[in-house]
């Protein structure tokens, strides 16, 4: 018995397990330590059973969870036990700490035990945040069951040996991707997969490794797919490249699916497109902005990109449309009569016009991109908003669409 108390290791075990001093006012608050042990055992057991069916892969992770919920016997119960026990574990930890602080469990002879507990708590909190990746969260925060159904098609998410090095080079992890675009079956799959969603897409040239980045609202992703690669009514630089290299040398990727329900989501969509434009700097894009690029001072490079869309022959055709044509005497007489018979403007109309042509200046929030307009109407068209919005801003703080500052030119 003396050895049990005097031995360095046995004495430590004896003081905590056998002769452990307990307070005289012991209550149910001392149950949380044992409850934590029960939670830990449940977590380990359910975690092992879930690991038997879960696949830690970008391609199959969501599908394997659905498999556990639908196909595995009592898989739904095991998953919910694992998730909810984790929540209760944290609750019991805080109650356990609170009890220790209230009853002074950090004092001698339990100072060492309390110190070990604090170390375990800090490690637990640190481990909880390990592996968190903000960019992945942005890309997959809105994945739902419909996307899981589409991800069950292997061709949508498995890049070819030609595309994979390009994706790895830029650290791109697409949600969906389509290659072999000359195959009619690929077009059908794209229609089925892209139609319900909105988000950021990317068109990649597999030969030159150049690419185009754009965004589409709900229902328009497939339209963009068809517009750029098949009907050639989208980006002219992409259309010229497809005609030059062939459709089989291109791939269509969905970089991120963004929900599209209200104006706030529309702003989020444009902000995400701006993020990819700034990060990836696509060669096929002409304007470096996602939304209205009015007022942007183009560089020589972007001007050259715009000139590529119009050959010299086409320029001459446009210039010669009305060259050498003259109006007949009948047409001239009709124009003259119309001008002479036009009624003079009333004083009320003149007052309305004077109010509407109030000159304004629009500036970005960061003080860049100053644009002057002769009227509020022109300014509203330029930044895609209603005239009332600008008038309301002029009477208030002067901020329009959370992106611009509007001021009256005096």
UniProtKB/Swiss-Prot annotation:
GO terms for molecular function: DNA binding; endonuclease activity. InterPro entries: Cyt_b/b6_N, Cytb/b6-like_sf, Cytochrome_b_N_euk/bac, Di-haem_cyt_TM, GIY-YIG_endonuc, GIY-YIG_endonuc_sf, Intron_endoG1, Intron_nuc_1_rpt. Residues 132-410 are annotated as: COB intron 1 encoded. It is found in: Mitochondrion; Membrane. GO terms for biological process: intron homing; mitochondrial electron transport, ubiquinol to cytochrome c; proton transmembrane transport. It holds the Pfam family NUMOD3. The chain crosses the membrane at residues 32-52, 75-95, 112-132. Mitochondrial DNA endonuclease involved in intron homing. To endonucleases of group I introns of fungi and phage. This is Probable intron-encoded endonuclease bI1.
């Amino acid at each position: 018995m003396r050895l049990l108390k005097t031995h360095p290791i046995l004495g430590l075990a004896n003081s905590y397990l056998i002769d452990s001093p307990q307070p005289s006012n012991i209550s149910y608050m001392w149950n949380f330590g044992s409850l934590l042990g029960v939670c830990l055992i449940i977590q380990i057991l359910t975690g092992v059973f879930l690991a038997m069916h879960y696949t830690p892969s970008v391609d199959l992770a969501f599908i394997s969870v659905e498999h556990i919920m639908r196909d595995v016997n009592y898989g739904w119960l095991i998953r919910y036990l694992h998730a909810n026990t984790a929540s209760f574990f944290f609750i019991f930890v805080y109650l356990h700490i609170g009890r220790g602080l209230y009853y002074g469990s950090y004092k001698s002879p339990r100072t060492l035990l309390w110190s070990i507990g604090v170390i375990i708590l800090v490690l637990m909190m640190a481990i909880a945040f390990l592996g968190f990746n903000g960019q992945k969260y942005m890309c997959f925060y809105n994945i739902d069951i419909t996307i899981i159904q589409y991800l069950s098609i292997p061709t949508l998410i498995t890049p070819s040996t030609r595309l994979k090095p390009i994706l790895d080079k830029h650290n791109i992890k697409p949600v969906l991707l389509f290659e072999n675009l000359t195959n009619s079956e690929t077009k059908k799959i794209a229609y089925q997969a892209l139609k319900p969603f909105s988000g950021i897409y990317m068109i990649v040239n597999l030969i030159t490794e150049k690419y185009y980045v754009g965004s589409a609202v709900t229902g328009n992703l497939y339209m963009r797919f068809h517009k750029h690669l098949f009907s050639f009514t989208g980006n002219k630089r992409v259309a010229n490249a497809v005609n030059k290299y062939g459709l089989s040398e291109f791939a269509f990727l969905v970089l991120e699916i963004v929900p599209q329900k209200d104006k706030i989501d529309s702003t989020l969509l444009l902000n995400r497109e701006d993020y990819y434009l700034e990060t990836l700097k696509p060669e096929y894009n002409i304007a470096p902005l996602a939304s209205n690029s009015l007022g942007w001072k183009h560089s020589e490079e972007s001007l050259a990109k715009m000139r590529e869309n119009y050959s010299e022959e086409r320029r001459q055709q446009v210039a010669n449309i009305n060259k050498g044509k003259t109006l007949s005497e009948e047409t001239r007489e009709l124009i003259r009569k119309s001008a002479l018979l036009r009624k003079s403007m009333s004083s009320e109309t003149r007052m309305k016009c004077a109010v509407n042509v109030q000159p304004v200046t629009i500036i970005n929030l960061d003080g860049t991109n100053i644009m002057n307009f002769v009227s509020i109407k022109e300014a509203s068209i330029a930044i895609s908003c209603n005239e009332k919005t600008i008038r309301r801003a002029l009477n208030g703080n002067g901020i329009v669409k959370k992106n611009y500052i509007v001021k009256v030119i005096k």
